[in-house]
Curated annotation (Swiss-Prot):
Source species of the chain: Mus musculus
Keyword set includes Coiled coil: no
Any Pfam family matching the protein: V-set
Alphabetical list of Gene3D superfamilies matching this protein: Immunoglobulins (2.60.40.10)
Something else known: The sequence of the light chain of this IgM myeloma protein has also been determined. This protein binds dextran.
Lineage of origin: Eukaryota, Metazoa, Chordata, Craniata, Vertebrata
Record-given protein name: Ig heavy chain V region MOPC 104E
SMART domains in UniProt: IG, IGv
Recorded GO CC terms: extracellular region; immunoglobulin complex
Keywords for this protein: Adaptive immunity, Disulfide bond, Glycoprotein, Immunity, Immunoglobulin
Glycosylation sites: 55
Protein's GO biological process: immunoglobulin mediated immune response
Molecular function via GO: antigen binding
């Protein structure tokens, strides 16, 4: 069974950073790009960026450049996203999703990030 297992919820203070994970199983990790998506309360999904697990190449939504950093660890079939300089606007659910030619065919359950002092 193809699965993406995301790390648990995070409660962080303004100005801090957070790094979440997305562990893939049931398929060859390097064969598919990994996308990251933000779901803010009451708002539509926003594409953050994607990463090619084969070579680590990344592409970012301009809005999230400098905010998000995407990396992978091929040895553990895990993708990571670090968010920096957090503010209340970054409070959201963040999803990883496997990309099949811009069709997101497998999704993680999401990681909830709450930014609060």
């Amino acid at each position: 069974e193809v699965q993406l297992q995301q790390s648990g919820p995070e409660l962080v203070k303004p100005g801090a950073s957070v790094k979440m994970s997305c562990k893939a199983s049931g398929y060859t990790f390097t064969d598919y790009y990994m996308k990251w998506v933000k779901q803010s309360h009451g708002k539509s999904l926003e594409w953050i960026g994607d990463i090619n697990p084969n070579n680590g190449g990344t592409s970012y939504n301009q809005k999230f450049k400098g905010k998000a950093t995407l990396t992978v660890d091929k040895s553990s079939s895990t993708a990571y996203m670090q968010l920096n300089s957090l503010t209340s606007e970054d409070s959201a659910v963040y999803y990883c999703a496997r990309d099949y030619d811009w069709y997101f065919d497998v999704w993680g359950a999401g990681t909830t990030v709450t930014v609060s002092s």
